[in-house]
From Swiss-Prot:
Organism of this sequence: Saccharomyces cerevisiae (strain ATCC 204508 / S288c)
GO cellular component, one term: membrane
Leader sequence segment: 1-24
Protein keywords: Membrane, Signal, Transmembrane, Transmembrane helix
Designated name of the protein: Putative uncharacterized membrane protein YEL053W-A
Domain of life: Eukaryota
Record membrane topology: Multi-pass membrane protein
Transmembrane segments: 39-59, 93-113
Subcellular location: Membrane
Note: Partially overlaps RPL12A.
Amino acid sequence: MLPLCLTFLSFFLSLGGSFKAVMTKEEADGTTEAAACLFWIFNWTVTLIPLNSLVALAISSPTFFGDRPKGPIFGAKAAEAPTSPPTALRYKYLTSLGSNFGGIFVYPLFLLSTF
């Protein structure tokens, strides 16, 4: 059995891999960052979501129903390239009170439970 100091150091060396394996990542929806500090775990999630568009307002316009507008038209003279819909960033901050020392204390507790 390794001394406690070597177990402690090996846990911190593998912290990046083991902590990321425990976390659930939503790669398609956004970016998740996490940091652990003693008994606190911080998670930051940034998600790019589409805004509610003004389609209902455009459909109810007189031009949509076939009326000819009166007066000058201030629209574009040439066809524009299609663009992506308007989006907004949604931030979610989660702070959890817990221990990130699970890798250290699991093995000694397992030995105690076998006796």
